[in-house]
């Protein structure tokens, strides 16, 4: 049986694109093993639930940590490479595919030491540290979003793999043309919520007049009551639903006329494939400010408005909402431009690349 080892750890932005590829590889008859970290809380829940064998190594990052960890990093990396080398000798995969997180560095290096083909996928518009390390050593590098840096122009942009359910909903999505009635606003701060959006969006909505809105606001854990209270006095509200978590994001995107959210790589790809106008507020402390670069992918195509968090706090969100919500044609134009950025074949393209290294049938 053909085997692939997938390495992805830490955040959903790394894990969920890898999971989409893993599921498709399994459907194609491949055995899939997964590498995470011993501290990886997300992969320790998600990967076994998807019925993939999960292996782990002792590997930690250096960003945001003290000098001691940085000084010991060469030894930590060498130890992790040896662990990965042993694992690869045991599993004997035909190909290794990395999707981000610190486990990818030692696994990618171990794969090259053993002569195992290495496929690297980078989700963000600014490549992460492990991608920068592995790209010169990889057999194939594929990008989820365009990277503006000149040295990355040689690599193909294939898009970010997305969940099957969301892609199915996107295929059924019709072009938006809500010419009258209430407009639907979706506010998403990520799985943990975003306090700045919980405060700024209600204030901006209360300043509106002459429109009617249905607002669905995902606020994060234990913020439901205070966020809902912040909307008191908003005369333009037809309906308001504040929730800690949205189970079906595909349905939420499908019904939205405008989304106000952060600018993670998967969010950018989901907005594009669903064809929705957006106001993007990048997380200001993201590594290498990669969310601002992600947001510019849609902004540069006329599909989104980019608002730095400092401007949101200073009240710019009010002006943008007034402008967009009183010009429905502008919203539909942005939605159409967003759809033009979509790359729904990302999963299949990555799967095809990995399958290039399958065993001969002879």
UniProtKB/Swiss-Prot annotation:
Keywords, comma-separated and alphabetical: Cell cycle, Cell division, Cell inner membrane, Cell membrane, Cell shape, Cell wall biogenesis/degradation, Glycosyltransferase, Membrane, Peptidoglycan synthesis, Transferase
Binding, UDP-N-acetyl-alpha-D-glucosamine: 11-13, 124, 163, 191, 246, 291
Subcellular compartments: Cell inner membrane
A cellular-component GO term for this protein: plasma membrane
Top-rank taxon, per record: Bacteria
Role this protein plays: Cell wall formation. Catalyzes the transfer of a GlcNAc subunit on undecaprenyl-pyrophosphoryl-MurNAc-pentapeptide (lipid intermediate I) to form undecaprenyl-pyrophosphoryl-MurNAc-(pentapeptide)GlcNAc (lipid intermediate II).
Name of the protein described by the UniProt record: UDP-N-acetylglucosamine--N-acetylmuramyl-(pentapeptide) pyrophosphoryl-undecaprenol N-acetylglucosamine transferase
Keyword Metal-binding: no
Transmembrane segments: none
GO biological process: carbohydrate metabolic process; cell division; cell wall organization; lipid glycosylation; peptidoglycan biosynthetic process; regulation of cell shape
UniProt cross-references to InterPro entries, sorted A to Z: GlcNAc_MurG, Glyco_trans_28_C, GlycoTrans_28_N
Entry EC number(s): 2.4.1.227
Principal subcellular localisation of the protein: membrane
Pfam families tied to this protein: Glyco_tran_28_C, Glyco_transf_28
Catalytic reaction(s) noted: di-trans,octa-cis-undecaprenyl diphospho-N-acetyl-alpha-D-muramoyl-L-alanyl-D-glutamyl-meso-2,6-diaminopimeloyl-D-alanyl-D-alanine + UDP-N-acetyl-alpha-D-glucosamine = di-trans,octa-cis-undecaprenyl diphospho-[N-acetyl-alpha-D-glucosaminyl-(1->4)]-N-acetyl-alpha-D-muramoyl-L-alanyl-D-glutamyl-meso-2,6-diaminopimeloyl-D-alanyl-D-alanine + UDP + H(+)
Keyword Amino-acid biosynthesis: no
Top enzyme category: transferase
GO function term, MF aspect, one: undecaprenyldiphospho-muramoylpentapeptide beta-N-acetylglucosaminyltransferase activity
Family of the protein in this entry: Belongs to the glycosyltransferase 28 family. MurG subfamily.
SUPFAM superfamilies per UniProt: UDP-Glycosyltransferase/glycogen phosphorylase
Membrane topology of the entry: Peripheral membrane protein
Organism from which the protein derives: Idiomarina loihiensis (strain ATCC BAA-735 / DSM 15497 / L2-TR)
Pathway in which the depicted protein is active: Cell wall biogenesis; peptidoglycan biosynthesis
């Amino acid at each position: 049986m053909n085997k692939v080892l997938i390495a992805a750890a830490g955040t959903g932005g790394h894990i969920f694109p890898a999971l989409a590829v893993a599921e498709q590889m399994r459907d194609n008859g491949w055995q899939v093993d997964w590498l995470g970290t011993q501290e990886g809380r997300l992969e320790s829940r998600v990967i076994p639930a998807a019925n993939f064998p999960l292996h782990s190594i002792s590997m930690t990052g250096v960003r945001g940590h003290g000098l001691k960890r940085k000084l010991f990093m060469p030894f930590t990396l060498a130890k992790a490479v040896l662990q990965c080398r042993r694992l690869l000798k045991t599993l004997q995969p035909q190909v290794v595919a990395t999707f981000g997180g610190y486990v990818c560095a030692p696994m990618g290096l171990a794969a090259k030491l053993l002569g195992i083909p290495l496929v690297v996928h980078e989700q963000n518009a600014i490549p992460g540290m492990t991608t920068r390390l592995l790209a010169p050593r990889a057999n194939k590098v594929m990008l989820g979003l365009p990277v503006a840096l000149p040295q990355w122009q040689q690599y193909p942009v294939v898009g970010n793999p997305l969940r099957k359910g969301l892609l199915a909903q996107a295929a059924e999505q019709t072009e938006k043309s809500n010419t009258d009635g209430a407009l639907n606003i979706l506010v998403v701060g990520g799985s943990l919520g975003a306090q700045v959006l919980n405060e700024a969006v209600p204030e901006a909505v209360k300043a509106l007049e002459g429109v009617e809105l249905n607002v669905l606001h995902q606020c994060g854990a234990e913020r439901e009551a205070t966020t809902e209270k912040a909307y008191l006095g908003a005369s333009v509200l037809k309906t308001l639903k504040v929730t800690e978590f949205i189970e079906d994001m595909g349905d939420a995107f499908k019904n939205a006329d405008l989304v106000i959210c952060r600018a993670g790589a998967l969010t950018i790809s989901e907005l594009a494939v669903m064809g929705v106008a957006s106001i993007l507020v990048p997380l200001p402390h993201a590594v290498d400010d990669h969310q601002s670069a992600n947001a510019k992918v849609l902004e540069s195509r006329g599909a989104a408005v980019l608002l730095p968090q400092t401007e949101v706090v200073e009240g710019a969100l009010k002006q943008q909402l007034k402008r967009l919500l009183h010009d429905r044609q502008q919203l539909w134009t942005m939605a159409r431009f967003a759809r033009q950025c979509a790359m729904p074949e990302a999963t299949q393209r990555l799967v095809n690349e990995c399958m290039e290294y399958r065993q001969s049938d002879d």
